[in-house]
Design a protein with these regions (language model features):
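Short beta-strand-to-loop acidic/aromatic patch adjacent to the donor-nucleotide binding site
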Residues: 107-119
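A short, conserved alpha-helix in the catalytic core of glycosyltransferases
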Residues: 186, 191-210, 214-242
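Short, acidic, metal-binding catalytic loop of nucleotide-sugar glycosyltransferases
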Residues: 20-29, 50-54
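Conserved short acidic donor-positioning loop in nucleotide-sugar-dependent glycosyltransferases
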Residues: 10, 22, 37-42, 50, ...
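Non-catalytic, C-terminal membrane-associated alpha-helical segments of glycosyltransferases
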Residues: 258-266, 276-321
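N-proximal low-complexity "stem/linker" segments adjacent to membrane-targeting elements
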Residues: 1-24, 74
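Glycine-rich, basic loop-to-helix element that forms the pyrophosphate-binding segment
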Residues: 67-70, 77, 84-105
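Acidic/His-rich active-site region of diverse nucleotide-sugar glycosyltransferases
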Residues: 76, 84, 93, 119, ...
Length: 321
């Protein structure tokens, strides 16, 4: 059984459309876990009402109380499980609620963590299952992410991490979707699976553990991929698994203050944890980040960046939100 985790935060319409696309998958051996991450816009009720209004003969919707999430055992007819978190502790924490729920189900074989602002090709899951069934050493597998607004152009096939600067970029971003790849070559070239579509084996999750909740936002996928590789799990890419992602080609200029702070602070967090020998090159590179904020007239963000740089060691363990 495949458990698909979809995290919602103030994005009911996207979540509903994501679930609708999942209902068209050409396999039936899956269940969908929707975790509402303490939305402030009545998302949970909107999702529940819309899904209940859909006429889907064999798809039963069940609400599981947050306090019962680790005790509930799914029934055969349960298809969509709704869980509402009482607080928002970030992307990793919200997804971990769904992942833990799946791990408590004896019939779980794989967990597919999927962004709510995605829609999937009907064969996307079939290809992921086939890929991981054929190579048991794969712990985490990614899809070919395609721009939702331009389905001829891919967003990426995994990601690459620059250790010196702790910057990341999507592998083969901007290429035509029609381009053919050797997935084994890609798997060797990438450093992490993009968080919009991460397909985990049960063995990987049981060995490596859950997503690290310290980050709150950004770098969670790099962290868990580095931990998986340290435990000798492979990262896989399945270029035949198409997932359409609604994110724009560039969103950096639109980051909120909190998101910008997380992206800066977490560069130091993950570097200190996995690549301490590069800590000072990453630290120095943040002067360029601060300068760019000032150049754009974002002086509050510039001050936050400098504050993180000069107080990181002192405030280690503090939240970025």
């Amino acid at each position: 059984m495949i458990y698909i985790v979809v995290l919602n935060w103030n994005g009911a319409i996207d979540t509903i459309n994501c679930v609708k696309s999942l209902m068209d998958l050409n396999v039936s051996d899956y269940k969908i876990i929707i975790v509402d991450n303490c939305s402030m816009d009545n998302s949970y009720d909107t999702i529940k009402e819309n899904l209940n209004s859909l006429y889907i003969a064999d798809k039963s919707i069940i609400e599981v109380k947050y306090e019962d999430r680790n005790k509930y055992k799914t029934l055969e007819h349960d298809k969509i499980i709704l869980i509402q978190s009482p607080q928002n502790n970030g992307y990793a924490s919200g997804n971990n609620i769904g992942i833990e729920f799946a791990l408590n189900q004896e019939n779980m074989k794989y967990v597919w963590v999927l962004n709510n602002d995605t829609e999937v090709d009907k064969e996307a899951l079939t290809h992921l299952i086939s890929k991981c069934d054929s190579d048991k050493s794969i712990g985490i597998c990614g899809s070919r992410l395609v721009y939702f607004a331009d389905r001829e152009m891919q967003q990426g096939l995994g990601g690459v991490h620059n250790k010196w600067l702790c910057t990341t970029k999507n592998y083969e971003m901007g290429r035509l979707v029609s381009k053919k790849y050797d997935d084994e070559v890609i798997s060797n070239d990438i450093d992490y699976i993009i968080g919009a579509s991460m397909f985990f084996s049960r063995e990987c999750l049981e060995t490596v553990g859950l997503m690290n909740e310290e980050y709150f936002l950004y770098y969670e996928e790099l962290d868990i991929c580095l931990r998986a590789k340290a435990k000798n799990f492979k990262l896989g890419i399945c270029s035949e698994s198409l997932v359409y992602h609604k994110i724009g080609a560039s969103t950096d200029g639109g980051k909120s203050m909190m998101a910008d702070l997380c992206s800066i602070k977490n560069r130091l967090v993950i570097t200190e944890r996995f690549y301490p020998q590069y800590y000072w090159t990453v630290w120095l590179s943040l002067f360029v980040v601060a300068f760019n904020r000032a150049r754009r007239g974002e002086f509050n963000k510039m001050k936050r960046c400098l504050n993180v740089m000069f107080n990181f060691k002192r405030n280690k363990g503090s939240k970025c939100h």
